[in-house]
Structures are given as structure tokens and as C-alpha cells.
Amino acid sequence: MDTDKRPIYPIQVWDITETEFDIKNNYRNETTFALSNGYIGTRGTFEEAYDFDIDTGLEGNFVNGFYESEKIRYGEANFGSPLLSQSLLNLPNLKETHVILADEKFDMMDGTVEEYERVLHMKEGILERKLIWTSPKGKKTRIQILRLVSFARKNIMLISY
């Protein structure tokens, strides 16, 4: 039994901050850093759309109203029991972005990462990722990515580099 009671993230009033990327915590962090406005929802996966193993990461993009229905079969009829089940569909990844810097594709799994930080600013509803990436050819680039799922315009998700 795990008796470690330390918090996973530093305790802050309105922010949740990840200070280093660790693939072992990626699946949990994709859930923690998710954004949603009740209409659009997206897991906190990276814009580079890594093809992680299913136990390491799972892309997730959802729009309210896109679901599949299936009949529920009961052994016997019960008054008030639902006739259909509904499952929200995981839609294609619309946030996948490939950034090319001096003929090299930005990839955190290739090259080295320094000063990594990912912050969910809950008061503003913004997910921010900052890091310094050194490419395999040795070029350093400071990268900042902001993501927002709008509450004012429910059908808009923004990504800024």
C-alpha cells in the first residue's frame, strides 16, 4: 500500500503545475490538464500528437452531441429502465500540430528538453506549456504553447505558439 501523502503537484491557488515531463505520469496528466466548456472537451495531450502505447497516453477530443447509442438488453422488463445507452465518441484529433524549426521537427522525445513547465491556469481556463528544446542537431529553441477552449464561443478551441 502506498502511504506517500505528498501532493502530486505544488499547491497553488488557481494553477496546477507540472515541472518535468515523466512518461510514467503522462496518462494521469493528460486527464489533469484536460480542457472543456461543456460543448468541446479535449484531453491534456500534447499538440505534437505522440503515438504513445495505450497504457501511456490516449488522445481524446469530444463534442457534446456526438455519441453512439445501443439498445440495453435486460433479462426482464422493468418500469423506468432506459432503453438505450449512449457513449460519447472520441473524435479525430483537431489539435495535432507539427512545428518545423530550421528543417527539424519539434519532438520532445527526440533531442533534449530543459526548463519544462506545463500549467493549467484554472481561473483563466488556459493550458500553457513552456520549455527549451535542443534539437538532435544542437539548435536551442524556446517554445511556449497556449491552449484555450472558449466559454464565450462554445465551438472554438484556440492554440497559440
What are these regions (language model features)?
Residues 2-160:
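Beta-sandwich/jelly-roll carbohydrate-recognition scaffolds of carbohydrate-active enzymes
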